Amino acid sequence: DPFGSVFSHQEFSPDEEMSRILLTSQTQKIDWKYLNKPWFRKNMQEQNFKLLIDRQRWFRTNSSVSNEFFRSNTLYESYQYLSNLFLSNGTLLAQLTKTLLRKNGFPSEWLCTLSNNERLV
């Protein structure tokens, strides 16, 4: 092959940087050449529309994940608060009952009921 032998010679083969410059300059010319063509603009509008849809999907997905985390965290904190409240109220009721039993602060008919309930005493 006469062309292959000529261009395979070291002095005639361009180096990587020169080939990169040539390729990018040719590509840029092609881009500018086709930039105002109707099919190119339509294609760009479709791509922009697809990017917009993908962005909205991503945002919707991530915002729903953060909303679920917020809801889950809020429920957990609410349950924790109510649990502590009921436990502390139960403890407070037990202490109050013990104090009133010691000081005979209950009417006599209540004493029977309270003394039978060992959890409060």
UniProtKB/Swiss-Prot annotation:
Described function: Probable ATPase of unknown function. Its presence in a non-photosynthetic plant (Epifagus virginiana) and experiments in tobacco indicate that it has an essential function which is probably not related to photosynthesis.
Record has Protease as a keyword: no
GO cellular component, one term: chloroplast stroma
Domain of life from the UniProt record: Eukaryota
Keywords, sorted A to Z: ATP-binding, Chloroplast, Nucleotide-binding, Plastid
Family: Belongs to the Ycf2 family.
Localization terms from the record: Plastid, Chloroplast stroma
Entry's Gene Ontology molecular function annotations: ATP binding
Disulfide bonds: none
Protein name: Protein Ycf2
Source organism of the structure: Vicia faba (Broad bean)
